[in-house]
Structure formats: structure tokens, C-alpha cells
């Protein structure tokens, strides 16, 4: 019995890398798969990043067990990573603070380390860049932020160290330049890139399945764009706990942890909002997310 890291899934097979030898092996699942979560009701699926037990049987390599995961995501299907790099374009597809906040909200729920990278800064005017950079700088209080010139391949070299000896998930809206960014880091990958749909202003999928690529002593996971960010994983009452900026002021709320930061009196978060310590758009997005969750929950209830 040996341990391996799942690198890729393709046509019912898994490309795995032996933990000790680093040999790449094509393996299949051996009958009923053993996994750490025996109480899980839904079908258990092997994910890229899983550590598995495999064996050699009649000249075939078979995966017999999946070891316990440290963390995982469902969109994309990936596990056991160290950090998430969110990639956003400042050109096309159009950058939206609401989408950024939505990503951050969901990833914060899973207590993941997040780094922000903004691409295509060379495709907008300097004036427009400075305006949007000023707003984005608010997030520097909580996350590391980098800007990338899509035409200058040397603009990514200073980012090499953040990948060192880590499994990094590269995520973001489709069409923002994730594959281009990866190619600039490691040209030998030669990942496919795509044109943006002129009609919709949205990206066309290039990456179809999550896959790990060896890089700088670790791995980079190029993932399919998040086609759907589902806020129904939240109860609207818990949303406030995943805003690190809200938490800075919530201890000053009269109702403490019970304050929703909406209609309550003596709310520390709303006071910070009035003092411009929290941006208007950030708070407005919070209200929109709560409204969306309540609407969806009500819709789901009526379907029963």
C-alpha cells in the first residue's frame, strides 16, 4: 500500500503522483472506495489534491482509499490546498466589487488564505486604473494584492515566491486571464487561452477540469471558472461573521454578536460606515447578499 497525490482526472482514470518517488501513475478506483467520511450520504467523489492509498494489482494501479481532507471546495472539486489566489480582470470581463465580495465571503467561510491578483491593467487608461486601484486598496487591510500587466511577461516574476512549496488554487471568473497568468509563470505549460465573448462580455471556458501543475516546489491548481457562487450555503444571520472589516467594529455594537448591522441602534459597523471607515459599496453588497439569501430560502421553502 502506497500514498499518492491526485493530480488530474480524465475519462474515468486518475493521474496520481507517488508521495515518496514522485512517479506519475495512471490509476483507477478499486471497487467500493473507502473514505474518511463514512456517514456522508451523497456519493463520495475523489478530488484533485486528495491523498490516496493505492496498490498494484495484476499490472493495474488501483485506488482503494481516500485519506482525510484538510479542506475542500466543491466548485471546483479540489482538496488539501494551502491558499487561494483570486484573479480578476480590470478590463474584460468587467470587474465588479460585488463579485469580489461574493468570492471573499464564500472563501472566508472556509477559513482559507486568500491572495488577490488583478490582471489586464495595461488595457485600461492610467486615470481609470488609479481610480479603481484607490478603491481596491481598501482590501489591502486584509489581503495581499498584486497587479499584473497582461502584455509584460516579466510582470509576474516577482510573484514566484508566493507559490513556493504550496498547493495553490487559482480561481476567478472565467475569462479573466488565469491560464495566461499561469503561462507567464511557466511557459512550458502552454495552457489554452480564449477570446472574450463580445456579445455577452463574459469569458468562454478554457479550463474544463481542475488539474495540478508542478511549480516552484509545490503545485498550482488551474480550475474551471466558478460558474455559480451559491450564497445559500449561508444563513443570513451568519453572514456578518465572514466580513473581517465588520468584525473590527462589531464589538462596539450595543447588541454585540446579535447585531445584524442593519436596523439596530448603536451599531458599531454603521457608525464606521458613517465615518467612511467602511466603504458604501462594501456595506451595500452586504445588504444585497442578505436580501438574495432570504429570497432564495423563501423560494426553496415554497417549492416544498
Curated annotation (Swiss-Prot):
Subunit annotation: Monomer. Associates with 30S ribosomal subunit, binds 16S rRNA.
Record function comment: One of several proteins that assist in the late maturation steps of the functional core of the 30S ribosomal subunit. Helps release RbfA from mature subunits. May play a role in the assembly of ribosomal proteins into the subunit. Circularly permuted GTPase that catalyzes slow GTP hydrolysis, GTPase activity is stimulated by the 30S ribosomal subunit.
CC terms in the record's Gene Ontology section: cytoplasm
Protein name, UniProt field: Small ribosomal subunit biogenesis GTPase RsgA
Keywords: Cytoplasm, GTP-binding, Hydrolase, Metal-binding, Nucleotide-binding, Ribosome biogenesis, RNA-binding, rRNA-binding, Zinc
Intracellular or extracellular location(s): Cytoplasm
Cofactor notes: Binds 1 zinc ion per subunit.
NCBIfam families: ribosome small subunit-dependent GTPase A
Residue sites binding GTP per the record: 119-122, 172-180
UniProt entry tagged with the keyword ATP-binding: no
Entry similarity comment: Belongs to the TRAFAC class YlqF/YawG GTPase family. RsgA subfamily.
Cofactor requirement: Zn(2+)
Taxonomic lineage of the native organism: Bacteria, Bacillati, Mycoplasmatota, Mollicutes, Acholeplasmatales
GO molecular function, one term: rRNA binding
Enzyme Commission no: 3.6.1.-
Binding-site positions, Zn(2+): 253, 259, 261, 267
Domain CP-type G: 70-229
Main location: cytoplasm
Alphabetized InterPro entries for the sequence: G_CP_dom, P-loop_NTPase, Ribosome_biogen_GTPase_RsgA, RsgA_GTPase_dom
Name of the gene this protein is made from: rsgA
An individual GO BP term: ribosomal small subunit biogenesis
Classification via SUPFAM superfamilies: P-loop containing nucleoside triphosphate hydrolases
CDD domains: YjeQ_EngC
